[in-house]
């Protein structure tokens, strides 16, 4: 197995291990994070109904002011956007789902920014 394939398998194992323990409810929905090399995405999902309540990413129009969209500054911007949209819909408490990514760098920056802007987890 190639090193890239091994990396993908390890990420999938981490993702399923984390997802097995985390479940979003109507009272505390799940804040899901996905990152690619170029962008970062965040969604607040109600797992009971299977509906995305709030979403934010570096692809959206609000992030056009960013020069680069795949760095820590962009992740902070997305964290602030998702927290602002969540508070508009009266969502104050969430369960954080790092989606198998290490809690470091962009994922940590997004989480810290969401906390600073009013979300609790």
UniProtKB/Swiss-Prot annotation:
Record's keyword annotation contains RNA-binding: yes
Task: Fetch the Pfam families from UniProt.
Answer: Ribosomal_L18p
Keyword annotations: Ribonucleoprotein, Ribosomal protein, RNA-binding, rRNA-binding
A cellular component term from Gene Ontology for this protein is:
cytosolic large ribosomal subunit
Q: Which GO terms describe its molecular function?
A: 5S rRNA binding; structural constituent of ribosome
Q: Where is the signal peptide?
A: none
Keyword Iron found: no
> Which processes are annotated in GO (biological process)?
translation
User: Cross-referenced InterPro entries, in alphabetical order?
Assistant: Ribosomal_uL18_bac-type, Ribosomal_uL18_bac/euk
Identify its protein family. Belongs to the universal ribosomal protein uL18 family.
Q: Which NCBIfam families does the annotation name? A: L18_bact
Q: What does this protein do?
A: This is one of the proteins that bind and probably mediate the attachment of the 5S RNA into the large ribosomal subunit, where it forms part of the central protuberance.
Give the PANTHER family listed for this entry.
Answer: 39S RIBOSOMAL PROTEIN L18, MITOCHONDRIAL (PTHR12899), LARGE RIBOSOMAL SUBUNIT PROTEIN UL18M (PTHR12899:SF3)
On subunit structure and binding partners, the annotation says: Part of the 50S ribosomal subunit; part of the 5S rRNA/L5/L18/L25 subcomplex. Contacts the 5S and 23S rRNAs.
Report the protein name in the record: Large ribosomal subunit protein uL18
Organism of provenance: Geobacter metallireducens (strain ATCC 53774 / DSM 7210 / GS-15)
């Amino acid at each position: 197995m190639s090193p890239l394939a091994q990396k993908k398998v390890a990420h999938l194992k981490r993702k399923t291990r984390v997802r097995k323990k985390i479940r979003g409810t109507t009272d505390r929905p799940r804040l899901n994070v996905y990152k690619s090399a170029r962008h970062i995405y965040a969604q607040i999902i109600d797992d009971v109904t299977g509906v995305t309540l709030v979403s934010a990413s570096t692809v959206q129009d609000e992030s056009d002011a960013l020069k680069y969209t795949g760095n820590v500054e962009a992740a902070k911007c997305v964290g602030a956007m998702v927290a602002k949209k969540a508070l508009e819909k009266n969502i104050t408490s969430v369960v954080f789902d790092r989606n198998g990514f290490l809690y470091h760098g962009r994922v940590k920056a997004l989480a810290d920014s969401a906390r600073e802007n009013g979300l609790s987890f």
